[in-house]
Amino acid sequence: VGMTDTQTQAYLLQQYPALVKAYGNLAAAAAVEYYNDLRATYDLDSDYTATIPEINKHYQAIGDVNRTLEEADDITQVQSNLSALSGRRVMEYADDTFTDNALRDPAHPRWALIPHAGACAWCLLIGSNGFVYSEDGVLASRHTHCKCTPTVDFGNSPGVQGFNQKKLQRYYSTARASVEDEARTQWAAMSPEERKKYTRTRTTRDGRKVGGNTPSYDAYLRNKIVSRMAKQLHIAEHKH
């Protein structure tokens, strides 16, 4: 006998967050090991040992379940959607571990999200920034199905194998130059209501949404650039 919708929801609300936490902790532990091993390869003046930070994805996991049950047509789609979302949440444990330790490390390393082979235009745009991030929460740009790798740089880095930031910057610059005039004209013609569709937000490690109340031309331009990069490179804009 199959479960009722209510029973299915209750089961998933209990099991899914626990699954995310269990595998997320494994990802965080792997990130700590990698961080410490990488740090040891540099001749640094300060001592520091990375640790797993306090990470709580419970409410985000609850949201994953409830949204999926609302949107999915059948149990097969529920399984598929939650499988993809759980992969994202688990990778966020690694992201948060890198960013938390980089912020506390007296060596003040920079960090970046390295695009994977076949990455979408959004991830290539993020990757084009290279090792420049220094603010809490910037790696919240990960999306569902994203397999990009977070990493840190302690200075004088020999580079990451397969990561060509200059090439990504060329992609970005070419796309931006081709859409800037059009974007500026379109933004000027928009009504206040239309502009409200374009805001800049980020998610903190505890799941809070910050920013996003004020229309942002930069957010609109960013979307135009991503769209143009996708067309020029014949890739997806944003892999959901």
How would you name each of these model-derived features?
Residues 1-103:
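N-terminal alpha-helical interaction blocks
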Residues 1-7, 11, 16, 92-240:
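Activation/maturation switch segments at domain boundaries
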